């Protein structure tokens, strides 16, 4: 039995990526939901304030989802998330998903994420807005919420080619790998409110999301 601890925010797409990789590899792990306002346990464990952070069996705690993924595949290589012949393509796709696509989906999901932190309390909501507006500029949250339709249209345009690609395959490159987990994490933005908001007409993408979501340790050959 492994002894791993994942420090996370539930709404983080990068934490969702790491959770699904751990599930795919069949690893036992404990989840610590970090309080957005009180990160002392995360700081004590990792020496920094960013999630995801993963404490390994050795006691070392590492941060950054890309680094965590690489270390996990080195320590627990079966099943691999980096099929040898496609490793570079998986890494390139993951960087795109965690960059341009992340920006689009984050903006599309911002109303749901604001509502999530509001449910946690006024202090959490205020601090969330402060962090976002320190990064993107004053008034960012309100402006982005008002532009929600445009944000959803941009997300739709970026997701449509992926839906088309998945028409004739179970996973992005045929065999499951790191890019699938990165995309899964980002699409978690569209489930923050509870209902999955991948457009209904994107049946291939919705089916793919379901396949990845059901992964625990080994992939059901029937899926």
Residue ranges of model-derived segments:
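GST-like domain detector, emphasizing the conserved glutathione-binding G-site
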Residues: 1-127
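Alpha-helix C-caps/helix-loop-beta hinges
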Residues: 51, 78, 168-169, 184, ...
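GST-like fold's C-terminal all-alpha helical module
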Residues: 99-207
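Intrinsically disordered, low-complexity polar regions and short flexible loop motifs
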Residues: 206-214
């Amino acid at each position: 039995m492994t002894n791993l601890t994942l420090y996370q925010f539930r709404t983080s797409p990068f934490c969702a990526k790491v959770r699904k990789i751990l599930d795919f590899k069949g690893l036992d792990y404990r989840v610590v939901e970090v309080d957005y306002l009180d990160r002392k346990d995360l700081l004590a464990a990792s020496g920094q304030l960013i999630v995801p952070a993963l404490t390994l069996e050795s006691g070392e705690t590492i941060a950054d989802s890309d680094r965590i993924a690489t270390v996990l595949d080195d320590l627990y290589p079966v099943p691999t998330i980096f099929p040898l012949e496609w490793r570079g393509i998986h890494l390139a796709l993951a960087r795109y998903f965690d960059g341009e696509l992340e920006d689009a989906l984050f903006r599309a999901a911002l109303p749901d994420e604001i509502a999530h932190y509001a449910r946690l309390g006024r202090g959490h909501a205020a601090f969330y807005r402060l962090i976002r507006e320190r990064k993107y500029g004053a008034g960012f949250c309100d402006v982005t919420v008002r532009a929600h339709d445009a944000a959803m249209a941009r997300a739709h345009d970026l997701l449509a080619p992926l839906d088309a690609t998945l028409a004739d395959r179970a996973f992005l490159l045929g065999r499951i790998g790191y890019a699938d987990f990165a995309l899964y994490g980002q699409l978690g933005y569209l489930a923050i409110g509870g209902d999955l908001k991948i457009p209904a007409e994107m049946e291939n993408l919705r089916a793919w999301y379901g396949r990845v979501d059901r992964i625990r340790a080994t992939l059901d050959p029937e899926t």
